[in-house]
Design a protein with these regions (language model features):
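Glycine-rich phosphate/pyrophosphate-binding loop regions near the starts of catalytic domains
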Residues: 28-197, 348-351
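Short, well-ordered alpha-helical scaffold segments within catalytic/effector domains
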Residues: 90-94, 204, 228-232, 280
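Acidic, glycine-rich loop-and-beta core segments that form the ion-binding/anion-interacting portion
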Residues: 184-222
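N-terminal amphipathic/basic leader segments beginning at the initiator methionine
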Residues: 2-34, 40
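Buried hydrophobic packing segments
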Residues: 24, 52, 96-97, 207-210, ...
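Gly/Ser/Thr-rich beta-alpha loop segments that engage phosphate groups in nucleotides
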Residues: 49, 70, 150-151, 173, ...
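Active-site pocket-shaping loop/turn-to-helix segments
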Residues: 82-90, 221-230
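Glycine-/charge-enriched secondary-structure boundary and capping motifs
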Residues: 2-11, 124-142, 158-163, 217-223, ...
């Protein structure tokens, strides 16, 4: 690729988006009072990956999420044998579910949002069959009922020949001790990082820009189109085993800056990291981004941060392994001004580089 290319140039510029999100959050806080007659919002979940309210003796959580542009890579490398839309369906569900469960919620119902420019998009039987199968299988993996959805035709908004995929979900937290917020975070907590399965659904616009420059588009497209992990069963297994989860951060947009998502002043010290998969190395080489820019944009091999007391680390890692995932006892919380320090990379992300709340 000629010259350096950044994610903000070809995809999302968070410096212009995040302030508007904060503005909306501020306005939204004025509506919490509308929950009455036995309903009460959990205020500390505003600005988290999922919103929680108390409902009688239980807590409920809700979320809405979108896939982004990963489906455009499936469209680009489609061949006679594969549409790749089973992976696309799976990953859309994964983006929704992995946000929902970060507060301890057990998924209940999930609704689809598939926006198209023209109904012709729906007439591709192979693609639709794969999308529906991937979506269904992912819901089964997450333990969620696919309750329905919306398929709007939006001429003039959606680009012809494409689809905007997203959805919403609701989950239940059966008791207060299973509710996960940042309230329990304390200096000395350990940070467990879970190994990602690759790019997941973030930073795809830059990946697409890289793909366009490569001779072997299919080979790169294949490693981009790996399924994201779904952690719904794992989180419930950890809670069932009475692991004292103090916080969870889903590492998506903003890369490893997301480790400090909690609105608290701690130094997040990361001593060990998983090796980035090949897809990240190709993106870095072709885009010209330096290591700090890559770790500030992508998950770079780790996509979930689970915060637990040191006494629970060994047991938690055993449960993670039994669920088929890999984890690292990666670091710890230290009292101090909010920042993430990646020690082995000599990279520091100051608190101001993640301003979501």
């Amino acid at each position: 690729m000629k010259g350096k290319i950044t994610y903000s140039q070809v995809g999302d510029d968070y410096s212009t988006k995040d302030p508007i999100k904060k503005l909306a959050q501020t306005a939204a806080t004025q509506t919490g009072k509308n929950l009455k007659d036995g309903f009460e919002e959990i205020t500390e979940t505003r600005g988290e990956s999922a919103y929680v309210w108390k409902q009688g003796d239980v807590y409920m959580a809700s979320v809405i999420e979108g896939l982004g542009t990963k489906n455009l890579i499936a469209d680009l490398i489609r061949n006679e044998d594969k549409t790749y839309y089973d992976i696309i369906g799976h990953d859309t569900v994964a983006t929704i579910i992995n946000d929902l469960i970060s507060v301890g919620a057990k998924p209940l119902s999930l609704h689809a949002y598939w926006a198209i420019e023209n109904n012709d998009w729906l007439q591709d039987e192979k693609r639709m069959s794969d999308l529906i199968k991937g979506w269904t299988d992912a819901c089964n993996l997450a333990g969620a009922s696919w309750g329905g959805g919306e398929t709007p035709t939006l001429k003039g908004i959606i680009t012809p020949g494409t689809v905007d995929l997203g959805g919403s979900a609701v989950g239940i937290i059966s008791s207060q001790d299973r509710l996960i917020t940042s309230k329990k975070l304390t200096a000395g907590d350990r940070i467990l990082l879970l190994k990602s399965n690759g790019l997941n659904a973030n930073g795809l616009s830059l990946a697409r820009a890289v793909l366009e420059t490569l001779d072997n588009k299919s080979e790169f497209g294949e490693i981009v189109l790996t399924k994201s992990n779904i952690y719904a069963k794992l989180i419930q297994d950890l809670l069932d085993a009475e692991i004292d989860i103090h916080y969870i951060s889903n590492i998506t947009g903003h890369g490893l800056r997301k480790i400090m998502r909690a609105n608290k002043d701690f130094i997040y010290v990361i001593e060990k990291l998983f090796e980035p998969q090949e897809v990240f190395k190709i993106i870095q080489k072709e885009s010209g981004l330096d290591e700090k820019e890559m770790y500030g944009t992508y998950n770079m091999g780790q996509d979930y941060a689970i915060f637990v007391p040191s006494s629970d680390v060994e047991k938690a890692q055993e449960i993670i392994s039994k669920n088929g995932f890999e984890s690292l006892d990666s670091g710890y919380l230290e009292a101090g001004e909010r920042k993430v320090i990646l020690k082995e990379k000599n990279i520091t992300f100051e608190g101001g580089t993640l301003d979501l709340r």
